[in-house]
Amino acid sequence: DETPNMWTFIMLDSYTGKNWQVQFSTKGTDYMFAVPINYLCKAYPSSSDRWEGRFKMFATQNMWTFIMLDSFTGRLWQVQYDTRSLDNLLCVSINEEVLETGDRSIFSIQPMTSMYQYYLINNESGAMWQFQWTTQGPDYRWIKRIN
């Protein structure tokens, strides 16, 4: 996914949920790299699974932060990249609970007025949750059902 920095991108494996920060440069290969943001798969497909596009990334108004959605289950993660320090790369759970099980994309997200809050929507049932990401720590990261 594209970031506001023309030399830095987030590469997403939409099949497993793994993602990397990719850096390009005109200064040569010493300044180019790809580093994992999260090392572990968020889903483990079998060879017969057809999960194309299962995971989706959404840019937030914060240039360093994306929301990753498992559109099959409703699970959410806050993904953060950094151009100054690789120690600041982050992929943390907003919602570990599997809200639905299935083999197709049924969830989407929509921003609210606050840059930190979104709606998670089950496009089949109409069920909705409100969730929040944060830079302040896990106590400020939450999700709640609203209907």
What is the meaning of each model-derived region?
Residues 15-19, 26-28, 73-76, 127:
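Primarily extracytoplasmic ectodomains and periplasmic/lumenal surface modules that are beta-strand-rich
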Residues 125-135:
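Short, exposed beta-strand-loop hairpins at the edges of beta-sheets
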Residues 20, 42, 57-60, 65:
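A general "mature secreted/periplasmic domain" signal
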Residues 22-23, 79-80, 131-132:
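Tandem-repeat architecture and repeat-register "anchor" residues
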Residues 26-51, 82-103, 134-147:
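Trp- and S/T/G-rich repeat-edge/linker motifs of beta-rich repeat architectures
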Residues 1-3, 46-60, 99-113:
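Beta-propeller blade-edge signature
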